[in-house]
Amino acid sequence: MTRVGRRSGAAASVAAAADWPEIVALRTRVFVEEQGVPPELEQDAADATAVHVLSRDTTGRVVATGRLLLRDGGTASIGRMAADASVRGRGHGAAVLGELHRQAVLRGVAEVELHAQVTARGFYERAGYEAHGDEYEEAGIAHVTMVRRL
């Protein structure tokens, strides 16, 4: 199923295996090239079991992505949220986040947690997340843990 952003018309859906190269390319552009995250930290073993969601622009190019990692006890974490610089603020990230929430609910998840970059805190607060704890550094970038009940 595809989730469409309320105001933007941006849509998001669960990624297929064939989408993986485009997801990796986007995450590399955003995290490694723009933000200076070491390449060896960008991909990890959790990618193999995660539910990946993506959004495409009008040309069909993957422009936003995120992943859902299921945990025990009806919880999950969301991570690797990335949007191409050309579409930031246009609803693609919100569409991806909404579809990740929908996928979590379908899997019986009641609460999601994420490690938000401090610069994106407002984005997550608008989506119903609350900060928990102090800021900390992850991969050289200031983060804060945020939680939302679904």
PLM regions with names:
Residues D47-T49, D72-G74, E138-A142:
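Short acidic/glycine-enriched loop/turn segments that link adjacent beta-strands
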Residues E113-H115, E125, E130-V147:
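Conserved catalytic-core motifs of GNAT/GCN5-like acyltransferases
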Residues V87, G91-E99:
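Conserved acetyl-CoA pyrophosphate-binding loop and the N-cap/start of the following alpha-helix
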Residues E40-G66:
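Conserved beta-hairpin
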Residues L97, A104-Q117:
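Conserved GNAT acetyl-CoA-binding A-motif
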Residues M1-A18:
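Conserved N-terminal entry element of GNAT/NAT acetyltransferase domains
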Residues L54, R61-L70, T75-A82:
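Conserved beta-strand in the GNAT
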